[in-house]
From Swiss-Prot:
One of its GO terms (molecular function) is IMP 5'-nucleotidase activity. Belongs to the ISN1 family. This is IMP-specific 5'-nucleotidase 1. Residues 328-350 are annotated as: Disordered. PANTHER family: IMP-SPECIFIC 5'-NUCLEOTIDASE 1. It comes from Gibberella zeae (strain ATCC MYA-4620 / CBS 123657 / FGSC 9075 / NRRL 31084 / PH-1). ATP binds at residue 112. Homotetramer. Allosterically activated by ATP. ATP binding is a prerequisite to magnesium and substrate binding. ATP binds to 2 of the subunits in the homotetramer inducing a closure of these 2 subunits and the release of the C-terminal loop, thereby activating the enzyme. IMP-specific 5'-nucleotidase involved in IMP (inositol monophosphate) degradation. Its EC number is 3.1.3.99. Its cofactor is Mg(2+). The active site is at 151 (nucleophile), 153 (proton donor).
Length: 446
């Protein structure tokens, strides 16, 4: 029984998104009932009828899920002591900051992906993920999108590469700035100097500096949050690197300021020992790298690849050890949350005295950072909100775009607790998402 538990939970559940898997399971029923794998493509009327019926049933299911989310949101807003039906079906369901027009989003994606016309391949994880992205895009454009935050690697540029001047994502980001939407790049890269971030983002920063249709205020509407939530840089046209560091005293939230340096050091010491044990026990070709606000393992020699399973094992081991210690907190969301109120990072609600951390798989390394992206996005919300109206940009007015949303070893996951999110799988998908947003904004204006 113990072995089965470990296999089913420790090695599988952390690689799934329970909400997406649940929706995918709902859509599997009409696929089985209405698909015609025994037909032939020459049988036009039969295939057309099948697609129409499957489309109708898929749309009905998405509408039913949409209504369940509405009920979940109403109970969030009322702080109801009784769980919603959605929460009973999916205990991990987090806060929703906006309605999700899933029926409309499905119809939109069905026109692009022809989900209803497929006879051999059921609606997939990626189909549902794209439907949710479209629904969230529709929701934030129906409201007022004020802040868009982005991960770096795999979101804005390929893993290990830089944001070059030829990148198609750059004109889309400039378009957001023209629309007076603030941009925060919230990356795990923990550089302490501006020149390293300029090296990674020079294509975008140079494009902003050279732009003739962005006013000075719009050019200042971008910040870089490095090391998850540890280093803030603002745009500076007079700097050779186009960035200037912002002292922590100017942007730390009161909760973040309460984390003592001694506790941070002790947490990183425990994490370093756990990482060292993993390197020895798994015989990893890796070495320890210690920074002032992070510790991790990287390959001993460039070009060496570490097995994905070994990286995941390391993340789960280190995370568990830190959670069991008296120092670290990796809570995923607050126990109470009103989506209409300023977002509260997850560890505040229950363990404000413990230091939040994020253990994540970087693709070929593992790092433990102080804080996580919920705090990084929160800093962006407060930084821009305080300049506009003295408050914080709300979760329903924030969209975080990233590629790592699985529940363990993924550092975008925590951002779900402080704003709306879009889950992409490549820079090309980011471009597609931004085009989708721009199109929806244009339709709203017209």
């Amino acid at each position: 029984m113990t072995t089965r538990y470990r296999v089913e939970y420790a090695l599988k559940t952390h690689r799934r998104d329970q909400f997406i898997e649940w929706v995918k399971g709902l859509l599997a029923v009409p696929f089985v009932l209405y698909s015609q794998p025994t037909g032939v493509f020459g049988d036009g009327p039969s295939v057309t009828q099948m697609a129409e019926e499957a489309h109708r049933r898929y749309a009905e299911i998405m509408r039913d899920v949409e209504l369940m989310i509405d009920d979940h949101i109403s109970r969030q807003q009322d702080d109801s002591m009784f769980p919603s039906k959605l929460r009973m079906l999916i205990p991990t369901a987090g806060p929703f900051f906006t309605r999700l027009p899933l029926e409309a989003a499905f119809k939109y994606q069905d026109r692009k992906r022809y989900i209803s016309s497929r006879r051999f391949v059921a609606p997939s994880f990626n189909d549902v993920r794209q439907i949710l992205n479209s629904a969230q895009s529709m929701a934030v454009t129906n409201g007022s999108l004020q802040l868009a935050t982005f991960d770096g690697d795999v979101t804005l540029y390929d893993d290990g590469f830089n944001l070059e001047p030829t990148s198609p994502v750059i004109p889309r980001l400039l378009d957001l700035l023209r629309k007076n939407i603030k941009i925060g790049i919230v990356t795990a890269a923990g550089y302490t100097s501006a020149d390293r971030y300029y090296e990674r983002l020079h294509g975008l920063l140079d494009a902003i500096a050279e732009s003739t249709d962005l006013d000075p205020v719009q050019k200042q509407s971008i910040i870089i949050m490095g090391g998850e939530a540890n280093y803030l840089f603002e745009y500076s046209p007079s700097s050779p690197c186009k960035l200037a560091p912002v002292p922590r005293t100017q942007w730390l939230t009161p909760e973040m300021a309460s984390w003592s340096d001694a506790d941070i050091t002790r947490l990183l010491d425990v994490a370093e020992n756990a990482l060292r044990d993993c390197v020895n026990n798994l015989n990893l070709p890796a070495m320890i790298m210690r920074k002032d606000r992070a510790v991790g393992i990287i390959p001993k020699t460039p070009g060496t690849r570490i097995a994905r399973e070994s990286l995941e094992e390391t993340v789960l081991v280190v995370q568990r050890i830190l959670e069991l210690s008296s120092l670290g907190s990796s809570e995923e969301r607050p126990t109470k949350h009103r989506p209409s109120s300023p977002p509260i990072p997850p560890s505040v609600a229950s363990q404000s005295r413990r230091v939040p951390f994020c253990a994540f798989n970087g693709g070929n390394d593992v790092f433990v950072d102080i804080g996580d992206k919920s705090w990084g996005v929160t800093v962006c919300q407060q930084w821009f909100g305080s300049k506009e109206n003295g408050g914080a940009i709300r979760g329903e007015n924030t969209l975080h775009v990233g590629d790592q949303f699985l529940s363990a070893g993924s550092n975008d996951f925590k951002a779900r607790s402080v704003g709306t999110t879009a889950w992409i799988a490549s820079p090309a998908e980011t471009v597609e998402l931004l085009d989708e947003l721009a199109d929806m904004m244009q339709k709203k204006l017209s």
